[in-house]
Amino acid sequence: MTETESLLENLKRRRVPQIAGMYIAATWLVIELGDWVTERFSLPGDLTSYVFIAMLVMLPAVLLVAYNHGAPGRDRWTRTEKVFVPINAAVTVALIWFMTPLIDVEAATETLTIQDETGALQEFEVARRGYHRELVSFFWENETGDAELDWLSYGLPIMLMHDINRVSPVITAGTPFESELVQERLREQGYDQFTGVPRGLAVELARERRSDVLVVGNFSLDGRQKVVSVSVIDATSGDVIETHTGSAGDWMAAADAVTTKVLGIWEITPTENQSDDPISEHFSSSLEAVEHYVLGQVAIKLRGNYPEGISEFDEALTIDPAFAEARSLLSVMQFLNGDIDAARASATLAMRNSYRLSTSSEFILKANRYIYDGDYERGERVLEIWSNVQPRSTQALQSMAQIAQIRGTPESLDKSIAAYDRLLELRPNYHTIYRL
């Protein structure tokens, strides 16, 4: 290097600007790729924030290495590099460690503003990308020795599902009754009643439908005490995350205790405008009404007996007229049975107690009320909003795709195709889609 060589020429000769530019471009590429990966595999969205901080803080070390080794020819590592690069890396790790609480603050949910079917703007609290948890509870084993309590094999998981789904958008729960894929697989394996499923098969099915965790359990009696024992299992590894055995004076309280245990795993608390009220306050105050509601679902899901199902729902509502979930489902069965006026009346009554419904049930009821009146455009819009609020809900996507397909407009058909495509991303093995 001559004495007249400028600093800029020296940096160019050592290729510092070129290497710095490539590093910045690589940083941008990694962040873009990271955003795609977190969205595709439902990973925490703040992972790219950590990557950005790490690559930004490591820039001084990159510039130093570029200055010493960028020029043509062979170079040796200097003492400065051997000291500075590890220190820079340590500072990066420390900075990420101290900034983690700042990055994680209120990261689980965000507010989404959407124009509803009437044109008004509505705010919805939704799970941030990568923070949503999906749970499937398989039906539990009756160890009471009393066959009259067999309905609780279905009833307890159903109560658990509705209880969890009211608490926070961060977690949604379901049972085999909500998954055609699981029902199809269970029948193929010979479990026509959807009970007695081996743990290994349950894990396989939960993994196949890309749930995060599954719940298996049993229930028994200890004198007058109602006892439930459940295991919460990681669907990916098959490892047990948490176990719970507890007793209560009634079956609803026993299911409430399981909800508390499940929510505690991820420290999930009720979000604004939602609560973890006792099941008896939001589902039904009568266990007898719940029994008829469950038996109605069993009649329809297992035997395809719609008249029996409707009769059971009617019985449940005779006992508890405020049972919103039962009345909403009754309206659907009446509609499918061709009794449009009865379906419309049931949906209207259910809407008076809509505060007792889970988020998904509320969307379904609202959309159905429009559909019963022949207003498919607004019904489609409600389901589209639901698919935006719960983007991992296969039920929302399938409902959206089907009604858009029924409307048949070019725009609706595009929405239907997009919904089916998204459904296949979430459930690649859901072959039934190809027959829709």
Write out the residue ranges for each language-model feature.
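Membrane-embedded alpha-helical segments of integral membrane proteins
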Residues: V16-R79
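C-terminal/domain-edge helix-coil "capping" segments
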Residues: G70, L95-G130, R199-L201, R224-Q225, ...
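Short beta-strand->alpha-helix linker/helix-N-cap micro-motif
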Residues: I114-S229, D234-T243, D277-H282
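Residue at a conserved register position within TPR or TPR-like alpha-solenoid repeats
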Residues: A299-I300, Q334, Y370, A404-R407
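Structural signature of tandem alpha-helical TPR/SEL1-like repeats
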Residues: N305-S311, N337-L349, D373-R381, I406-R422
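TPR alpha-solenoid repeat register
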Residues: A326, S360, A396, T432-I433
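Canonical tetratricopeptide repeat
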Residues: L329, S399, R435-L436
